[in-house]
Every structure is written in structure tokens, then in C-alpha cells.
Amino acid sequence: MSATAEDNARGAKPAGNFARTVSQRKRKRLFLIGGALAVLAVAVGLMLMAFSQDIRFFRTPADLTEQDMASGSRFRLGGLVEEGSVSREGSELRFTVTDTIKTVKVVFEGIPPDLFREGQGVVAEGRFGDDGVFRADNVLAKHDENYVPKDLADSLKEKGVWEGK
């Protein structure tokens, strides 16, 4: 009996079939690796899109576009509390944020920070309502009478309206 006939009698597969199954395994492994890389690429892309909205700490009133006002997406609005703009109506605190170029009306429901006052730096987090008023659910104020957030000071300096240090 020849060697091939003996191998066939013992149940061994012919060499041609073995080569075919190896190439099928390689192909399956390649598809599996390719699929995993595609899923990973999509996941990284989605994460980058989610983080891209939080790259800037806040937007000033002059930075806002019609799209920001209409989209309903959350962001941080930074600027100075305009003198004479603070009022209380029930549990709502109403004030205007300015960067001395443009102003935005803000409504905040809650207790403002202890250091919140007119003429001071503020960052309000929320979204625009249908009425065009910024609805803040979180308000951050400056630390002391000489402090203005660095990002806000830099932004105001760029616009040529900053008179501080």
C-alpha cells in the first residue's frame, strides 16, 4: 500500500484539504482582526466626537452663533455679570452675562454661589430655551474680588476689552 493510501485508511486528510483549511483559518482570523479594528475605530471616533464639545471651557456671548442658540445643546457661558442686571423672581435668579461686546440674558433656578455679584466673573452651565434666554442649572463665581478665570481674561484680552492685569 502506498503512503497516501495508508494515510487515507487511517483517516488522515489529504494534503490539499489541509492547505485549504489553513487558508480558511487565516482568512477567518484576518476577518476577525479586521472587524475588531473597525469596531475600535468607530468607538474612538465616537469618543472624540463626544469630547470635542468639551474642549473649550466656556463660550463668551460674542462667541455664540445662531446654531448655539437654536441647537438646545448644553455648554458653558462665561463673562461678567452686567451691572444693574441682577433680579430675583421667586426662586429664579435673573441676570445678564456680558463680554462688553454682546450680552446674554440668563435665568438660574437655585441658590447662587456666595461670591456671585454684579461686575464679577461668572460661568453658567446650561442651554438656551425656546425664548432665547440661557437657562442655567449651574453657576460658578470667581474666588475673590481680584480673580477672573484665566480663560475669561484671555478671551477678553483677545477682544481688546480687558482692563485688568
Curated annotation (Swiss-Prot):
Superkingdom: Bacteria
Membrane topology type: Single-pass type II membrane protein
One of the protein's GO biological processes: cytochrome complex assembly
Intervals, Cytoplasmic compartment: 1-29
Bilayer-spanning residue ranges: 30-50
Keywords: Cell inner membrane, Cell membrane, Cytochrome c-type biogenesis, Heme, Iron, Membrane, Metal-binding, Signal-anchor, Transmembrane, Transmembrane helix
Subcellular localization(s) per the UniProt record: Cell inner membrane
GO cellular component: plasma membrane
Residues at which heme binds: 143, 147
Its biological purpose: Heme chaperone required for the biogenesis of c-type cytochromes. Transiently binds heme delivered by CcmC and transfers the heme to apo-cytochromes in a process facilitated by CcmF and CcmH.
Family the entry assigns: Belongs to the CcmE/CycJ family.
NCBIfam families referenced in this protein's UniProt entry, alphabetically: PRK13254.1-1, PRK13254.1-4, PRK13254.1-5
UniProt name for this protein: Cytochrome c-type biogenesis protein CcmE
Species, as recorded: Brucella anthropi (strain ATCC 49188 / DSM 6882 / CCUG 24695 / JCM 21032 / LMG 3331 / NBRC 15819 / NCTC 12168 / Alc 37) (Ochrobactrum anthropi)
